[in-house]
Amino acid sequence: MTLQQCRSLNKCLYKMSLEFNYYKTMVLSVKTQIVAGRRKVAKPIFFLAILKAIEKQLLLENKIRYTDELENIYKSLYMEYGEVLSPMKYPFYHLKSDGFYHLQGDFPIKSPTPKLLKEKVDFAYFDESLWKILQKKEYRQELQKAIEDYFKLKKI
C-alpha cells in the first residue's frame, strides 16, 4: 500500500468514525415516553431488532419492511430484556421523528396499525451514511452495547 493510499484510507476511516459517533448520538437521543415513572424502550429495542435482522441477513438493502420476521425478532428482544411489550407498530412509525429513519409510501397515518403500515408504507429506510455504517459488524456491536448501556437494558 502506498503512502497516498494509506492517507486516503485514514481519511475514510476518520470520516466513518465521525459519522458513526454522530449517528450513535442520534440513536441514543431518540425520543422516548415515560409512563408511570418508567421509560418506554420501544424505539431502542426496534433499532436493536433491525441490527439483528442485518446480522441474520434478513435485511440486505436499506428497505425495512413491516414483516413477521422483523416483528418476531422485536418480540424476542423484549422477552430477552424482560421489558413489557410495546407493539412494533409504534416504533416502526414514530422513529421517523428522530431524524435518521424515514418512511417511503402513501400516508399520513393518524393511528398506525400493522395492516395500514403494511399497506401504506412501502418501506422505511435509514440515512445512507448510517446504512453503510451498519454493514460493519464492529459498528453494529458497538451500537448495541451503547444502546443497552444507555437505556439500561439487561438480558435476563
Language-model-detected regions and their locations in the chain:
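Intrinsically disordered, charged low-complexity linkers and terminal tails
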Residues: 1-156
